[in-house]
Amino acid sequence: MSKAYEQSGVDIHAGYEAVERMSSHVKRTMRKEVLGGLGGFGATFDLSQLNMKAPVLVSGTDGVGTKLKLAIDNDKHDTIGIDAVAMCVNDILTTGAEPLYFLDYIATNKVVPEVIEQIVKGVSDGCEETNTALIGGETAEMGEMYHEGEYDLAGFAVGAVEKDDYIDGSAIQEGQAIIGLASNGIHSNGYSLVRKLIKESGIDLNDDFDGRTYLETFLAPTQLYVKPILALKKAVQIKGMNHITGGGFYENIPRGLPEGLAANIDTQAFPTPNVFNWLQQQANIDTKEMYNVFNMGIGFTVIIDKKDVAQTLDILKQEGISAFEIGEIIEDKDTPIHLEGVE
């Protein structure tokens, strides 16, 4: 049976080896609330151990987009899993939820145990940094669905927040401050354009760029904001949060704003990493479009009362994150976001 299955394009033994290789990485992500071990039909998590009065579960799912193609083409698979985790946990974090567990899905042309191990290592690194248990996953070998060497990666995260602490933006008011947390580069959006520009420019990805190679710059993993935001939440009343992903500033910052309010952003209040200047020069596009595609150096925003700005910046600095007061909430019924220095 297994021989016939292998002849049809599925290598069971390679799958077994991949599971064996990834197990040590997965185990280091475990939390005390996880019941049972690896390999069950369903993964279990004991919410009662969180000692929450009225827990609200928050879930999110996402992928890494065509950044995967850049990783695959350059045989660099050990950090792309961090991106998968970050795209999910940063999203659910905007509600004030603490990420609890994560599941991954890898679909590939052919299971290569060494590659699968590197992918899952990255996922585990992201989970370990955010205290999120990698509680389950699926690796699917589908030769007829993908070209040789190709794979896709997606993730699913679940977190919890006390019902009374749930952040939905309803407490946002005119005059409150917007704090921007620095990104780690491009993160995981806009890579169809990025890859096009890499090809057209003819650069050698191993050449130096701004203190590291081009490849390291383009594959720098998405920043994880869980630890600094959870630390901030203990000290400051957060009114709203946004994860700056696809659609850049224009699509993400207005999300969750009450009707009649808008965000006024000073684009001179934070530094723009050189990689975005390079992309803009290569693409020959205007600055407004850049802010409509990329994070431009700000990967996450927090809305707080003005009186809490100094304390917020201090806490985030202690947590190792560069942060800036980048704007404020204003009254505007027509235009949900204004970018000073761009428009």
From Swiss-Prot:
Q: What's any GO biological process attached to this entry? A: 'de novo' IMP biosynthetic process
Superkingdom, natural source: Bacteria
| Gene Ontology cellular component annotations, sorted alphabetically | cytosol
Record's keyword terms, sorted: ATP-binding, Cytoplasm, Ligase, Nucleotide-binding, Purine biosynthesis
Its UniProt entry gives the catalysed reaction(s) as:
2-formamido-N(1)-(5-O-phospho-beta-D-ribosyl)acetamidine + ATP = 5-amino-1-(5-phospho-beta-D-ribosyl)imidazole + ADP + phosphate + H(+)
Task: Report the InterPro entries cross-referenced here.
Answer: PurM-like_C_dom, PurM-like_C_sf, PurM-like_N, PurM-like_N_sf, PurM_cligase
Q: Which SUPFAM superfamilies match?
A: PurM C-terminal domain-like, PurM N-terminal domain-like
Pathway given in the UniProt record: Purine metabolism; IMP biosynthesis via de novo pathway; 5-amino-1-(5-phospho-D-ribosyl)imidazole from N(2)-formyl-N(1)-(5-phospho-D-ribosyl)glycinamide: step 2/2
Annotated EC: 6.3.3.1
ATP-binding among keywords: yes
- Root EC class: ligase
Whether Ligase counts among this entry's keywords is yes
One Pfam family from the record: AIRS_C
* Signal peptide (residue range): none
Sample GO molecular function, one term: phosphoribosylamine-glycine ligase activity
Can you say where in the cell this protein is located?
Cytoplasm
Family according to the record = Belongs to the AIR synthase family.
| Name recorded for this polypeptide | Phosphoribosylformylglycinamidine cyclo-ligase
